[in-house]
Every structure is written in structure tokens, then in C-alpha cells.
């Protein structure tokens, strides 16, 4: 008989995830249908989003050649029925205070920093780059982890050394670029460009660096259509940039600079976001989301 969610002690809430304790060594990592943008948790939810994120992470954890935090399969008997398909049993780790970002293309906050200073996280970039320019080699551009509701700040490698030490900082850079390259190469064979992504790492009791949290999901990555890619313009995408674009567009009526929460998402934006996330999973994995475990919304 599967345990009930109430059998486990709730430890923490994030923008999208809930964390519960199973025992001294294992946690229950639950992905909800919440969606966040611009450091706000939106009032609207995306049906099945938590299941899609979990399915995508499981696919990439299996694909990537790096130790990860999984401690059981997606149908592990320790997972309660009510969160089956959106929860994973994971190892407890000492999480490192760095958002490990890999960028293959210039966009988002990276483009903003480049236009101001010609640099990105302490790296001097060549002149003449524009929206969606591809880098000669992927860049490691770390960020500090902010508290819930605050904004992660891009930092340089020296600041990472201050946070975790020189040896661990070098290991984070190497592992981040290795994982990004492997995942992005796979995605490209499926017609998808992963423009950038972020990883989180922890350390286990033996001191081994372990990939944790989520990996290559549409929440943590920018997914572009490879056949529609054009340098110099904003790219159509599978990820939550679609939601960000609506929020900052005239249709939403939201003033991002004002101290007001974002408005609810219209039904068509919710439905289109769900469809994009499912399409990303199915194209990347070659699997049908309809066959993923757990109850559909």
C-alpha cells in the first residue's frame, strides 16, 4: 500500500516544487502545476505541468553521463498515489549556493548585460553580437541563488570561488558545460535548440558532486525551434518565455515596474503553454506523454 502524502513531513516550498522528508537519507521532490515568471508565482496554473517537468527530468537524468540525485524510479512505492507522476524520491544532499548556467546563445539577461558592458559574468565577448547570436563555444555564466521572490544575480567565476572554493568552482564549471553539451547535442538531433539552461548541484556524504533539482525542462531552459532559428530576432519557443512574452505585451495590461502581481493567464495562454511543454517532451524523448504515469489533469 502506498503511503499518503500526509505521512511525510513537509520541509519547504519553492516557486514550483514542494519538498517532503521520507527518512534520514531520502526526500520526496514534488513538482506542482504552478508557473513563475519575473520572480512572481502566477495565480494561474498549467494543467499537467508538474508531470511534464518530472517526465522530462527523468528522461535527461537517464541520458546524461553524470551522477544525479534520483533514489528510485518514477513509480517508486514510496511515492503517494496523489502525486504519482509528478514526484521523485531523491537523495538528501548538501546543496551548493550557485545556479550553474550554461549558454550556447546570447539572449535574455545575458544580452542585457552584454549591451551594457560588452561582458557576461566577467567574460569579455566579441563586438557585434545581437539577439540569439551563437557563441563559438558554450559559456559558463553562474548566478547567485536568491531567496524566494528575489532575483538571481549573475556573478563571475571569482565570486563562485568565494562561495564554494576554487576546486569545487572549477568542477561546477566543467560539469555544467559537459552536461549542457551532451543535452544540447541530443536536442539538436530532434530539431530543438537548447539556447541556455541552468542546473543545481549538491554534494553527497562522500563529497561527490551530484546533479539535482530539475534538468533540461522547459522551466529551466530555453527551447527554440531549430528550423525557425534566425539570428537577430526573438525566437519562437517551447518554453515559458511564451508566458513571459504575454505578460510583458500590451494584452496583459501588466506594468512590470509597478509593485503589483501579474494578472491571471487567459485560458488560451494556459492551453498553449501546456501544449508547448508536451510537444517539447515528446520531441526530445520520442515518447508519448499520454503514456507517462499518474493521473492527467
From Swiss-Prot:
It is an enzyme of class 6 (ligase). InterPro entries: SAICAR_synt/ADE2_N, SAICAR_synth, SAICAR_synthetase_CS. It comes from the Bacteria. GO terms for molecular function: ATP binding; phosphoribosylaminoimidazolesuccinocarboxamide synthase activity. One of its GO terms (cellular component) is cytoplasm. CDD domains: SAICAR_synt_Sc (cd01414). Belongs to the SAICAR synthetase family. This is Phosphoribosylaminoimidazole-succinocarboxamide synthase. It comes from Mycobacterium sp. (strain JLS).
